[in-house]
Curated annotation (Swiss-Prot):
Protein's name in the database: Early E3A 11.6 kDa glycoprotein
Location within or outside the cell: Host nucleus membrane
Keyword line: Early protein, Glycoprotein, Host membrane, Host nucleus, Membrane, Transmembrane, Transmembrane helix
UniProt keyword annotation of Glycoprotein present: yes
TM spans (from-to): 41-62
UniProt cross-references to Pfam families, sorted A to Z: Hum_adeno_E3A (PF05393)
Membrane topology, record value: Single-pass membrane protein
PTM notes: N-glycosylated and probably also O-glycosylated.
Glycosylated residues (UniProt): N14
Protein's organism: Human adenovirus C serotype 6 (HAdV-6)
Main location: host cell
Amino acid sequence: MTGSTIAPTTDYRNTTATGLKSALNLPQVHAFVNDWASLGMWWFSIALMFVCLIIMWLICCLKRRRARPPIYRPIIVLNPHNEKIHRLDGLKPCSLLLQYD
């Protein structure tokens, strides 16, 4: 075997400060990620975190509001003839427990 070459391998042990691994050689991204603090972008990380928290909070509120059952308000009509409460929502009538003098 004359003239055989070994393909270059990527050393995954040499990772960036974030722990991300990539087979691509992107020096701009590598410099941006490693120099995040020196670029004055620390405030961007905090702002992005708060934006994500607000979005997640809104999603949870909207899901909970949609999942709530509708408020049940029975329609009750007093019938003067037989002292029973007649319900217009289809449920059984119940006896009037209040005694009037």
